[in-house]
């Protein structure tokens, strides 16, 4: 099955992509865990902007023709430097998110990285997320965009994704991902945050 070629985002796309990501993730449990009240929308925007800027520098972000969906990947080589994202985020996070918020962010990053190391070894593609504008959800746009970007992975490496929304696991399993592990991140203001690791085996040559 042929997929429409997605558009790779460039630096001028950053601000609208952050806005789209913020709308799509407004109720995401990981964002709610890190950015619990009284952290406001401006500080959530800062966190998402840092994430996207990191992807622009060390990975690739794609959108569909309508600009209603995003898929974020990190390059396999970047995964050899697990400290880089922490260094970029954690020190300024103390100012932006407060001490409690910065510690929850630290715990989330470290727990997700720990489960990934337990689930696989060696080079792999890391899927950071799929985001769809609320008005476009339920139309299959996220599925089509993710499928198209999976087809663009040029090296025969496995793909890994960390998810915190149990109702979305079937979405990724329908695209070839398999459940690889589960762990608890911690207790947040909204309750316990859990994390699932999903692994898509390397394509056969």
Model-derived features with residue positions:
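Conserved GNAT acetyl-CoA-binding A-motif
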Residues: 123-125, 152-164
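A short beta-loop-alpha structural element at the N-terminal edge
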Residues: 5-19, 27
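Active-site rim helix/loop that mediates acceptor-substrate recognition in acyltransferases
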Residues: 38-60
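Helix-loop element at the rim of GNAT/NAT acetyltransferase active sites that forms part
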Residues: 19-38
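Conserved beta-hairpin
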Residues: 53-74
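Conserved acyl-donor/pantetheine-binding loop and adjacent beta-alpha core of acyl/acetyltransferases
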Residues: 72-131, 137, 186-191
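Conserved active-site alpha-helix within GNAT-family acetyltransferase domains
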Residues: 143, 159, 165-183, 189-190
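Conserved acetyl-CoA-binding loop-helix of GNAT-fold acetyltransferases
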Residues: 128-132, 138-151
């Amino acid at each position: 099955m042929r997929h429409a070629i997605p558009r790779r985002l460039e630096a001028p796309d950053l601000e609208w992509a952050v806005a789209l990501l913020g709308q799509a993730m407004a109720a995401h449990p990981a964002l709610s865990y890190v950015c619990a009240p009284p952290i406001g929308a401006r500080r959530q925007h800062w966190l998402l902007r840092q994430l996207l800027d990191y992807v622009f520098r060390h990975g690739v972000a794609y959108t569909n023709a309508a600009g209603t969906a995003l898929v974020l990947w990190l390059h396999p080589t970047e995964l050899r430097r697990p400290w880089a994202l922490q260094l970029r985020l954690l020190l300024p996070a103390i100012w932006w998110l407060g001490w409690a918020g910065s510690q929850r962010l630290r715990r989330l990053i470290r727990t997700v990285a720990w489960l990934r190391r337990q689930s696989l070894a060696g080079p792999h593609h890391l899927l950071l997320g799929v985001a769809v504008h609320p008005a476009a959800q339920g139309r299959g746009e996220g599925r089509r965009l993710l499928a198209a970007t999976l087809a663009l992975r040029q090296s025969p490496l496995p793909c890994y994704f960390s998810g915190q929304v149990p109702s979305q696991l079937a979405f990724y399993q329908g695209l070839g991902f398999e459940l690889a592990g589960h762990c608890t991140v911690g207790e947040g203001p909204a309750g316990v945050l859990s994390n699932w690791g999903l692994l898509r085996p390397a394509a056969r040559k």
